[in-house]
Amino acid sequence: MKTRLGCLSNKSDSCSDFSEFLPPAQERTTRCLKLSNDEVTRWADSFDILLSNKYGLAAFRTFLKTEFSDENIEFWLACEDYKKIKSPAKMMSKANKIYKEFIDVHAPREVNIDHRTREETKNRLLEPTPHSLNEVQAKVYSLMEKDSYPRFIRSKIYQDLLNRTQIYCQRKSV
């Protein structure tokens, strides 16, 4: 048991294979050239910049999986999808799905929110609007920005990716 737990706690340090979030092998040679060192460096400038970049988002998701806390980004992404829904019936269905998966106290991927926020969100979702999840989404975003994001920037995943893009750019310019 101790050995297993030791492996789990070291998991985020042992990840150097970025194949999880890079394109399939046949597409890497052309697509990964688009991932510049400047782009990867900018991810450290702000959480918004990281999330707005598809490779940055994928790298962050991979990192959160190594920390067993990917429910936060998955919830945030589900909320982003929810905001795009126009049909009231589809909105109600998606709201219920999000509530059951992330917000309910018995949710399989429960996000860490306070009781008041949980109850207010539950009440807002009785008659969902495109903005019903804004408050809880903002709280989860803030939690990731203040907690997970700084750890990601210091992580081996990010540092290795930064180093790989530096090496690639140096080789390319020679």
UniProtKB/Swiss-Prot annotation:
- Residue stretches making up the RGS domain: 46-162
Statement: the UniProt record of this protein carries the keyword Membrane: yes
Q: Which GO terms describe its molecular function?
A: GTPase activator activity
Where found? Cell membrane; Membrane; Perikaryon; Cell projection, Dendrite
The keyword Membrane appears for this protein: yes
What lineage does the source organism belong to? Answer: Eukaryota, Metazoa, Chordata, Craniata, Vertebrata
Gene Ontology CC terms: cytoplasmic side of plasma membrane; dendrite; neuronal cell body membrane; nucleus; perikaryon; synapse
Key words, A-Z: Cell membrane, Cell projection, GTPase activation, Membrane, Nucleus, Signal transduction inhibitor
- Record-annotated disulphide pairs: none
- Which SUPFAM superfamilies does the annotation name? Regulator of G-protein signaling, RGS
What PANTHER family does its record include?
REGULATOR OF G PROTEIN SIGNALING, REGULATOR OF G-PROTEIN SIGNALING 8
GO BP term, pick one: regulation of dopamine receptor signaling pathway
Function description:
Regulates G protein-coupled receptor signaling cascades, including signaling via muscarinic acetylcholine receptors and dopamine receptors. Inhibits signal transduction by increasing the GTPase activity of G protein alpha subunits, thereby driving them into their inactive GDP-bound form. Modulates the activity of potassium channels that are activated in response to G protein-coupled receptor signaling.
The record's listing under PROSITE patterns reads: RGS
Species this protein is from? Danio rerio
Q: What is this protein called?
A: Regulator of G-protein signaling 8
Q: How does it sit in the membrane?
A: Peripheral membrane protein
Q: Which InterPro entries match?
A: RGS, RGS_sf, RGS_subdomain_2
